[in-house]
A protein has these predicted regions:
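Glycine-centered loop/turn positions within well-structured domains
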Residues: 132
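Short, charged, intrinsically disordered terminal tails
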Residues: 173-191
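Short secondary-structure boundary segments
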Residues: 128, 151, 173-174
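Acidic/glycine-rich phosphate/pyrophosphate-binding loops and surrounding catalytic core
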Residues: 1-108, 112-119, 135-140, 146-148, ...
């Protein structure tokens, strides 16, 4: 029993430390935006084979999951916009092709935001927007769609970003850069 424990303890402790680090980091982000109404969400950037566990750790830390897989929701990204010939066209094509699936649209300018709002988007990812532009996006949207700030976020800027009125902060670092907690286990001789 003791030798088997010595073989298996390090991988188990590494996994526990990794997941605990994610939960702890998420908790810090959640605390940073407390009282603002904004929620912390993870992204699709997870470790292969560990997605469910990492997303569970985010929930344990008080955050929300963006999506578990492509079947949960569609995310229209910049490459889709180029392929479709515009952000509104990309959104409309996905909405028509998958009518029952929630569609989030990534925009990188206020002009693109206006286009997707006119097309009927109900969830918009604001990519690398400065804080002033986030506030302007909230003003322009007037509650017609949920807004998610993404890109360039830090724990130090989280409260300021949340104060703009966005609904979500998308934080990829929760799963791809969270520090691993130092967790150990010691065997003790039987009495």
């Amino acid at each position: 029993m003791g030798s088997e424990m010595c073989i298996r303890d390090r991988p188990a402790l590494n996994l526990i430390g990794h997941l605990s680090g994610i939960a702890t980091a998420t908790g810090a982000w959640v605390a940073a935006v407390h009282g603002s109404g904004a929620r912390i969400r993870d992204t699709r950037k997870t470790t292969p084979g560990l997605r469910r566990l990492e997303k569970y750790a985010v929930r344990c830390g008080g955050g929300m999951n963006h999506r578990m897989s492509l079947s949960d929701a569609a995310l229209v990204k910049d490459n889709h916009v180029v392929a479709a010939g515009g952000v509104a066209a990309a959104f409309t094509a996905v909405r028509e092709r998958f009518p029952g699936v929630p569609v989030e649209v990534e925009v990188d300018s206020l002009a693109q935001l206006d286009e997707v709002l006119a097309a009927g988007a109900d969830l918009v990812l604001l990519d690398n927007f400065p804080v002033a532009d986030l506030a302007e996006a909230v003003r322009r949207t007037q509650g017609r769609a949920l807004l998610e700030a993404s890109g360039g976020l830090s724990l130090d800027s989280a409260a300021e970003v949340a104060a703009t009125g966005v609904d979500f902060l998308a934080v990829g670092a929760l799963t791809h850069s969270a520090p691993v907690l130092d967790i150990g286990a010691d065997l003790r001789p039987e009495d």
